[in-house]
């Protein structure tokens, strides 16, 4: 199965390209990037062909594409790929605006193509085990969740609101919310959030706290801050403490690792030994395309998490709790 990558603007594209080239039933044959220098470099690195014209790439025999462009460009690239009837894996967030996300879902339905959104945390074995335990009632009725998705400040277009749609809240709320919706089979009722810029001299938020009430009454807190220093062993963390009436489960998605101490690199590094979540995401997408089944993570999942992000920004602006408007 031949696959193309549309843009390496997002750093996750590197992992997706790696796992495409390692997959026994897939090959990365085509790359487009608005940055020709970056595009040519990636094509050489992964033994692929660089296209300076996106239409030319989409006219090839690739069956599917992975879109890793700047957030604001997701809609245009999904529309174009769908028009050529290519199956689509789109980097998160699905879009920067709710109406754009809805239109992206619709255009993919109209053209009969898959729209999968890149939420790889679902593929972490420890997270999957926690989901099984929660749904089996091992901690009773869930009443609260305390979660973090901290990270290092990525810089570049991520801190340019016109390209990213926002800062750390846009970048990190969505991962936690996707896992919670999937794990608890619940939706958000209301949101209260406060954001600020505390760590860096940038024009988007890099710190904040989000408090949610789910339809079931579960209370959730999320810290989505870019608060990890450059010396942190990995890019960030994904942690959850799930409190139930009969017990508590704590999980760290990146806990399965060894530590590498190397003076030459100037920092401690985490060396993961568990299955990589990005590999799980790519494998699932390839299986969807080959079998024709619906993806594990749909465009609607992307829309639901984006709604929470937008409600959080609204709450921060109003300084009050906001009822979620589901589309």
Model segments located where?
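Rossmann-fold dehydrogenase core element
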Residues: 103-120, 140-145
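Active-site loop of classical SDR/Rossmann-like NAD(P)-dependent oxidoreductases
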Residues: 11, 270-282
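N-terminal Rossmann-like dinucleotide-binding module
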Residues: 1-45
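C-terminal helix-rich "cap/oligomerization" subdomain common to oxidoreductases
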Residues: 5, 26, 43, 56, ...
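Predominantly a Rossmann-like dinucleotide-binding segment in NAD(P)-dependent oxidoreductases
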Residues: 11, 121-202, 319
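Beta-loop-alpha module in the N-terminal Rossmann-like domain of NAD(P)-dependent dehydrogenases
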Residues: 35, 46-107
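Hydrophobic residues in well-ordered beta-strands that form the structural core
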Residues: 52, 90, 115-117, 222, ...
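Contiguous beta-strand/loop segments that form the cofactor/metal-binding neighborhood of enzyme cores
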Residues: 177-256, 280-293
